Amino acid sequence: MDLKNGVFHGRPAYWLAILVLLAGLLLSLLWAVTFGSVDLKMGDVYRVILYKVTEALHFPVGDSEVYGSGSMSDIVWFVRLPRLVLAIGVGMALALAGVVMQAIVKNPLADPYVLGVSSGASLGATLAILVGVGSFLGSGYVGLVAFAGAFLVSMGVIALANIGGRATSVKLILAGTALSAICAAVSIFFLYVINTSSGALEAVVRWTMGSLAAASWDTNLWMLAVSVLGALFFWTQYRTLNLMLLGDEAAVTLGTDLHRWRIVYLLAASLLVGFAVYTAGIIGFVGLVIPHMVRILFGTDHKKLIPISALLGAIFLLWSDVLCRVVLPGKEIPIGVLTALVGAPVFIYLMARKKYGFGGGD
């Protein structure tokens, strides 16, 4: 199988990268908590986390009055740490979805936006906020309706791509582009015709630009668990994902029918995007930039690409959230805006610096 090598190749470089990224993620998490309107020391952050974790295990370590309660403990444990953990989970999910969707359609420009999944989520959120669709579901109904929109659009993409024959990578892209345009048009239509308050319009805009401000431990742990399970699942599928880079004809000669796996992987990736949208709104560019960066550095083998992309996506979104909170004092920049502002120049730089094949002899 012709898989392109990156700048760093070989087993030692791969495992070294995994260890460095794991250590970097842990250190980034501790360091990032110190940033905000109230300055904190990393040592205090570590002691608060240590106390809270050991307290949950019924043998608290540390001074309960300093690290178990009070303003510092509340800021670390209930305000900053939850949204950073959410950033890790969402970053992993979006990077994984980008890797998988690019392999499914054999196109390095594919991401949740190209295949219409994000547009479906945006339409769902717009209908929930402006019309009240799904309001009977409770306080988190906007995220649930957005999740449903993402999933329904992914099903629609599969159905359209199978019209007139089996789904191919080109038909998936065309179906995704068409449904994405329809969802965007419907969203704009409702924004135009419905006489609603400025607050509702602001909520729609805020949702479509992404935010981690509503993070809580309940949703965070679910998001993180889904992302980790998704990474493990797709890592076990690296051989089939590598075959997708060769194309259908070559895969059939090797005894693998890619049609069924495209559907399975698209649904699984859509679930990852749906959970990310449910917890954080629409955040773009992560699923496009991170896989490109990893391919340039480590090649196109999905055995390496999947875990490294997941870790790098987590670190990228974690620090993006930090910048959102500290760039403008007293204001928070929507994280989707920042990922685009940071991601687009990085993407252009990487593409200008080194040309590389997508795999399969391209």
What role is predicted for each listed range?
Residues 1-362:
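Alpha-helical transmembrane segments in inner-membrane proteins
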